[in-house]
């Protein structure tokens, strides 16, 4: 018998070889109908996969990320099965589940798959799913795998198999389709009831631009048609909120092919927005005792060899810069942490000096393939709101609590009211790959869990997801239309202090290694602004928005009065512009609403005579007429009330 421990701490005994579905059925037949996959000691299993040892166990349904992952992974195989029937001779690359759906990279040979072909492929997928074929997992030797896929002419699969270790190869079969795959999957194709293939794109095999361009087909599936219909409505709303579209309308940022792909340029209004975000975080960091530094935009190759980043990320770096005299190699800075380690080393440190908190808005450069670039969310140059905390092991929990306070202030100030966290810990079994002592790891992991509990932060624990150098805490926010975005990270690091031989003198007069904590509440300025645009649809909080007020004279003879009002507002630290175009007032109102300017002040003869303005609020319409001095007071009070909440 084996012991199965459930999330509530209860324990049941089952026969060795029991599977997830049988465990679900032993609890409730209704539950067994709803489950899609299960977790066994932190690893996601198919429901039919045997469990042969004592295990921590959890069942996953549609509402769980792991449940959706298994559902969409099987959907990718269903897509491949449909393509195999419709396009004889097609070859398959990879077909993973992704955050919202799945894709499959295929080589259709002479055929060309276009977006107009997608409805026919969807119909074939629905036909196949209706057969309710079982999805069967099988372990296979490397020799047999190479023969099976080689006989089918699957060169891409054979390439993948050649790199795998014998004894760790599995296939999944449904109907007439067999794929090389680790899983997990559904037990049958029956739950896949609603299908939408969304896009056809090109993708280089294995992401290398010197390899063949394959056809990538994206899709999403659901267990009910109603869910798909709701998703399609959400998709339309997401298009309206696309930060690339709104950023252009609001004149926040731009890209230029001449400057280079993936290199955003901030226009005056976007720069004003970004600088206010930075100043906002600076004020908070000052309160929490951070010291700001500035480091160079490049670094010697030796710096990144020491840090280990050269070996791990060298292929993602831009080509080195060679100095003509010394013949040294320099790289555009891909991250800020090695520079901050050197700052730490600049002075002898005592246990009394810790924690030391170093912050920087540091611009970094990383090479991303052209096909991966996307607006501000995936770029080749971006600015991180980076900070590194050097502390003693016994200070880790307190530092996590402080950083969590900062992140909470940031999110709530931007009206992200719904957020949760993921705690990434070591693998429960395989611990050889992690650097640092077991004692330090256990203390850090427990500190993170306790910090989340103390703050009442909903947190999901993922075993085996920690980096080799330390556990971490990732924050996920939910935007106005329900999408989840990863923003903000706190990461413990035992690796860099070791590599840079960082030390402090302890109270015992012995030298000790500090613990390093990486943190970035925004993540990067570019990504955060993109998410904020899509969350607010460009209607930023009043204190943050680039232009708070647009003054609209009804004709050119009131332009002078409009300028007078503008100057008064600016003297009272209100960001105002005058729209003095020779356009009808209705057109001016519509255009400035399109620019998401919160307040519009309409001025004509009556207003000019009485020193007044007619006030309109974005989304609320007419707010009446008042003296412009009174309006300035009301607006500043509104802004101050927002700021006081920080």
Curated annotation (Swiss-Prot):
Cofactor entry? Zn(2+)
Q: Where does Zn(2+) bind?
A: 337, 388, 518
Q: Name one GO molecular function term.
A: tRNA binding
Record-linked Pfam families: HGTP_anticodon, TGS, tRNA-synt_2b, tRNA_SAD
Quick check: keyword Transcription in the entry?
no
What does the entry give for GO biological process?
Answer: threonyl-tRNA aminoacylation
EC id = 6.1.1.3
Residue span of region Catalytic: 242-541
SMART domains recorded: tRNA_SAD
Q: InterPro entries recorded for this chain?
A: aa-tRNA-synt_IIb, aa-tRNA-synth_II, aa-tRNA-synth_II/BPL/LPL, Anticodon-bd, Anticodon-bd_dom_sf, Beta-grasp_dom_sf, TGS, TGS-like
**What are the UniProt keywords, alphabetically?**
Aminoacyl-tRNA synthetase, ATP-binding, Cytoplasm, Ligase, Metal-binding, Nucleotide-binding, Protein biosynthesis, RNA-binding, tRNA-binding, Zinc
Q: How is the cofactor bound?
A: Binds 1 zinc ion per subunit.
Looking at its record, which EC class is this enzyme?
ligase
What top-level branch of life does the organism fall under? Bacteria
| Quaternary context | Homodimer.
- Biological role stated in the UniProt entry: Catalyzes the attachment of threonine to tRNA(Thr) in a two-step reaction: L-threonine is first activated by ATP to form Thr-AMP and then transferred to the acceptor end of tRNA(Thr). Also edits incorrectly charged L-seryl-tRNA(Thr).
Report the HAMAP family cross-referenced here: Thr_tRNA_synth
**Similarity-based family:** Belongs to the class-II aminoacyl-tRNA synthetase family.
Protein name (record): Threonine--tRNA ligase
Source organism of this protein record: Bacteroides thetaiotaomicron (strain ATCC 29148 / DSM 2079 / JCM 5827 / CCUG 10774 / NCTC 10582 / VPI-5482 / E50)
Supply the source organism's classification: Bacteria, Pseudomonadati, Bacteroidota, Bacteroidia, Bacteroidales
Q: Which gene encodes it?
A: thrS
